[in-house]
């Protein structure tokens, strides 16, 4: 297979934990021809979606800080429909440049390209707002641009989490209680004087046991979750915010949530999704560049990367 991976610069990968790295390793092991490009190197020329893509050889990292784990050749201008699969792995934020990239990908799909996840799905499934489609699994939630609404929501629930709709890695997430002396300044900063839409959710105390990432690949649920456990005194479990990742078997509730969402995600062309679950509550649906492969693979000896490559191969033939 000939595969294009759209991702951040490969030299920036933290190979000891990066999910895209093990995806590439598995695909290289299968003898697939690999190319890399940046989302900013997509363009439309004479009506066709093209990319400045570099073919590369996967060498493998010799240490955690080895940034020479690949050998790239000169970039070539290639149309996306000439690949067997195009895998979008660019990290958020989902800004205007990201939006344009998804529109290019949708056009490429119309021209015959097989894109995972689909451009349309990434536009439709904002990682925070997507949970509103599955309210039976969520804690009380508010989405608003008005700080007065947030204050009323805080008064109702007493202890809440607020977060931007376009963040990642726990950035911009605050916990508020009624006695917090900084409520005003936090809301002004995050909501930019009622000009920025945010999400508020009732605080879920089970966060101390971990914010679980549940992976769904090709409509199938990975049998292990990655519980991201916050540091002492921290409310964010994100690994980027210092959380500790512990792989564990899915609970009955985890499986209920995942198996309910899996068919809908598959229907929408989402080959890979990462559900975030705290306690019994769904908090996010990640579809841009879900992570957690390496921790599950190392701790549970379950080959998530192979499951992903199998799904890419199967879906690319549909």
Describe each region flagged by the PLM.
Residues 1-4:
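Extreme N-terminal starter segment of soluble prokaryotic enzymes
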Residues 6-7, 13-16, 233, 249-318:
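ATP-dependent carboxylate activation and anion-phosphoryl transfer catalytic cores
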Residues 11-29, 35-143:
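Conserved N-proximal alpha/beta basic substrate-recognition cap immediately N-terminal to
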Residues 9, 91-93, 165-167, 290:
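Short glycine-rich anion-binding loops that position phosphate/pyrophosphate groups of nucleotides
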Residues 19-20, 147-148, 155-159, 169-257, ...:
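Phosphate-binding site of ATP-dependent enzymes
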Residues 28, 109, 154-155, 266:
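Anion (oxyanion) recognition and catalysis
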């Amino acid at each position: 297979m000939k595969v294009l991976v759209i991702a951040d610069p490969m030299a920036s990968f933290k190979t000891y934990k990066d999910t895209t790295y093990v995806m590439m390793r598995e695909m290289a092991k299968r003898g697939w021809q690999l190319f890399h490009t940046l989302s900013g190197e997509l363009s439309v020329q004479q009506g066709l979606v093209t990319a400045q893509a570099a073919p590369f050889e996967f060498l493998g990292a010799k240490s955690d800080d080895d940034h020479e784990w690949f050998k790239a050749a000169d970039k070539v201008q290639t149309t996306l429909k000439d690949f067997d699969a195009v895998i979008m792995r660019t990290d958020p934020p989902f800004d205007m440049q990201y939006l344009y990239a998804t529109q290019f990908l949708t056009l490429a799909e119309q021209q015959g390209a097989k894109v995972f996840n689909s451009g349309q799905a990434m536009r439709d499934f904002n990682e925070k707002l997507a949970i509103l489609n599955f309210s039976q699994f969520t804690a009380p939630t508010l989405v608003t641009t008005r700080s007065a609404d947030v204050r009323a929501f805080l008064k109702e629930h007493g202890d809440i989490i607020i977060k931007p709709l376009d963040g990642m890695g726990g950035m911009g997430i605050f916990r508020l209680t009624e006695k917090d002396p900084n409520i005003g300044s936090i809301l002004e900063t995050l909501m930019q004087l009622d000009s920025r839409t945010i999400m508020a959710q009732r605080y879920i105390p089970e966060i101390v046991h971990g914010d679980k990432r549940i992976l769904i690949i090709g409509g199938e649920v990975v049998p292990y979750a990655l519980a991201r456990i916050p540091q002492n005194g921290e409310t964010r479990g994100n690994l980027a915010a210092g959380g500790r990742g512990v792989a564990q078997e899915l609970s009955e509730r985890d499986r209920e949530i995942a198996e309910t969402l899996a068919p809908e995600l598959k229907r929408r062309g989402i080959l890979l999704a990462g559900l975030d679950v705290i306690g019994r509550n769904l908090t996010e649906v990640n579809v841009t560049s879900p992570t957690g492969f390496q921790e599950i693979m190392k701790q549970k000896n379950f080959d998530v990367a192979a499951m992903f490559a199998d799904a890419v191969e199967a879906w690319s033939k549909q």
